[in-house]
Amino acid sequence: MLGALKWFFGLGLVAVIGISAGVYFAFFGAGPQITYVTPDLVPIDLNTAAPSDRPPVNLPTAVVLRVPFTTQAPLGNWADRQHTCEEASLLMVDRYLRGDHSTGKIDAQTADRGINQITAWKPAVDLEIHQIGAVAKKYMGWADEVMPATRLAMKQQLALGRPLIVGVRTHGLGNANYPGFRTHFEDTGWSVSHYLVVVGYDTSDSFILNDPGISKGHGWHIKYDQLMHAIDDLVHAYPNLNAGRVFLVLAPFTNSSK
């Protein structure tokens, strides 16, 4: 918890409380209007049989969590930030859990400081998803769970107010804004291992991403099958990072058995 007490990066020490449910509206440039349907954040109960930790029986038709965004190179220094997607993903989720529900971009200097701090905490340059959870637990004080990436499980966790961190291979996402997408599609060195944040799903059954790997990764919509392809592509191309079709959730923790 000592690391968690030091973790503030412009937010100050913020008490973790339930995120109030509500409906909000926002625009991203010339893109479609996004409706933020924000459920209460449910802590992860260390007592796994606790009813408070169970997902709702009737899922909302759409959930979009108000998670702030940063790229992994907030100052534009992409050449030096090729391996900081884990940091950027953790930073976005951590700020959301601590009460930053701005949905816009995190201040670039603040984001850069946060990324540098998490880099200092990482045990290796590239992390497997369980290691990302361990960093969040040790230094940020969050409970962590790695879960199978089924369509239902992803929606259930989002309905509990929890963003998802997912490992993928970049070109598998189908986002043509990625370098080399049109000329070197899924070639080694162009399509690379990557982590991003799933912040919601919409009424058309698309999932919504905060993807730190490109400047145009904020609010990217992707179908479930496409996302699974990107996960499978990571599994095949980077066996050292192979965790299968899974995602990571972070949240405050409680223990109802005490």
Where in this protein do the model-derived segments appear?
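Active-site-adjacent structural segments surrounding the nucleophilic cysteine of cysteine proteases
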Residues: 2-130, 170-172, 177-181, 203, ...
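Noncatalytic regulatory segments and standalone regulatory/sensor domains
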Residues: 7, 34-41, 50-51, 174, ...
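Extracytoplasmic
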Residues: 64, 80, 161, 191-195, ...
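Proline-rich low-complexity regions
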Residues: 68, 74, 161-163, 212
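Short, flexible active-site loop motifs that bind/organize anionic cofactors or intermediates
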Residues: 80, 144, 217
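Stable alpha-helical elements in mature extracytoplasmic
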Residues: 81, 86-93, 128-136, 150-154, ...
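Sec-exported extracytoplasmic/periplasmic mature domains
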Residues: 90-102, 116-120, 137-145, 159, ...
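Predominantly the structural core of cysteine protease catalytic domains
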Residues: 122-195, 199-201
